Amino acid sequence: LGRAPEAFEGAVGGFQFLDGAMLEPKAMLLSEIMSAMNFTGFFFPFTGEANINVNAPDCFIPCTAMHEISHQRGIAPEDEANFIAVLACLESGDAEFIYSGALFAYLHLGNALYKASPEAYHDVAATLCGEARADLDANNSYWASRDTEAAAISESVYTGFLYTQG
């Protein structure tokens, strides 16, 4: 997490609206509770803190940090924060962040592709390297083990909150 603010600066060069204070994301002590609620991170606007669930699979923590830094820099919509997070990861020059951003992009684009064409999705998925496949499998297992009624309620409430925010 300590490298995240500096890594984020790679995206700022081309997009001055992303410029801002270099605040380090905070590892949450209550990460297991965040996992139970299906949260990988959240931005707390009253303190300006980007809070990260450090119990979530390691492969997505750098991209999650970039997502929350996007919120710190004024990007409110979740899909836009996701886009900026991937951009920042890919422009960071840091192999760990680049991998995390690419894997996150694959996850979201793969889900969209699967809805449009399961056959095309399977063709693309077959090209993944073993490490990426293992990380995605570990991510799926992690979240499946936390698929509870509390998680469903939390997700429903948060989704409702996001809709009220536009």
Residue ranges and their predicted role:
Residues 1-54, 58:
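Auxiliary, metal-adjacent structural segments of Zn-dependent hydrolase domains
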Residues 51-55, 66-74, 95-96:
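Second-shell loop/turn segments in exported
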Residues 59-63, 80, 97-104:
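Alpha-helical scaffolds flanking conserved acidic
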Residues 63-82, 86-87:
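Active-site recognition of the HExxH zinc-binding catalytic motif
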Residues 86-118:
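Short helix/loop segments within enzyme catalytic domains
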Residues 111-127, 131-136:
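C-terminal amphipathic alpha-helical segment
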Residues 128-166:
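Pan-zinc metallopeptidase signature
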